[in-house]
């Protein structure tokens, strides 16, 4: 809407420098995101925009982390996080959250929607970075994450992107004359599914 007080987004962060090699960090913040244009632009048989009164999706993030710098070119960070979602879009016809409708290439949100869903995401991340040393650099990260959203029934169930395990690795080598070659690897755990007999 046009009232900025309804989407006021306070954010706070702290960093505590234990010594030259170790930092502790903490942050909390509220964020708002406009629903997708597919949802906002949906019209019924009378050519009326049925979702024009949807609320912004609200999320509040809580993060605690550490940073370890054993030497100038090497860094390890760890982070634990929890995110809480409100006003998440839910299908008016099925009562299912849009976050639980699959990750295929179909059009999601082109229907009447309510802003009644809730959700949560939580987990931790470990990030390791080696800056350029003897022509070689690398970055490796591992994230464990759980993602759950509710529809009209209020029961949190795994979302379509509840992959649990995410791994990313980049290895690079720099040569003379600004030439560089690299390899990248990504892994995402399987999507949730309902078993059947």
List PLM regions with ranges.
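Gram-negative outer-membrane beta-barrel transporters
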Residues: 82-84, 105-195
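Residue-level signature of outer-membrane beta-barrel architecture
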Residues: 6, 16-17, 30, 56, ...
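Hydrophobic, lipid-facing positions within transmembrane beta-strands of outer-membrane proteins
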Residues: 8-14, 50, 60-64, 76, ...
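Outer-membrane beta-barrel proteins
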Residues: 2-5, 51-56, 115-117, 157-160
């Amino acid at each position: 809407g046009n009232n900025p007080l309804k989407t006021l987004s306070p954010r706070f962060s702290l960093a505590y420098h234990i010594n030259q090699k170790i930092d502790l960090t903490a942050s909390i913040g509220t964020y708002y995101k406009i629903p997708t244009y597919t949802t906002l632009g949906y019209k019924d048989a009378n050519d009326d925009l049925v979702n024009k009164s949807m609320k912004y999706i609200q999320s509040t993030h809580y993060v605690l982390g550490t940073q370890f710098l054993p030497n100038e070119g090497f860094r390890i960070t760890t982070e634990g996080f929890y995110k809480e979602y409100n006003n998440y879009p839910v299908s008016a016809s099925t009562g299912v959250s849009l976050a639980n409708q699959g990750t295929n290439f179909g059009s999601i949100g082109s229907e009447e929607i309510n802003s009644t869903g809730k959700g949560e995401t939580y987990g931790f991340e470990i990030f390791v970075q080696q800056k350029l040393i003897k022509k070689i650099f690398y970055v490796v990260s591992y994230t464990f994450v759980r993602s759950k959203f509710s529809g009209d029934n209020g029961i949190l169930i795994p979302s379509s992107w509840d992959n649990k395990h995410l791994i990313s690795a980049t290895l690079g080598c720099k040569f003379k004359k600004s030439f560089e070659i690299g390899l990248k690897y990504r892994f995402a755990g399987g999507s949730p599914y309902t078993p059947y007999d």
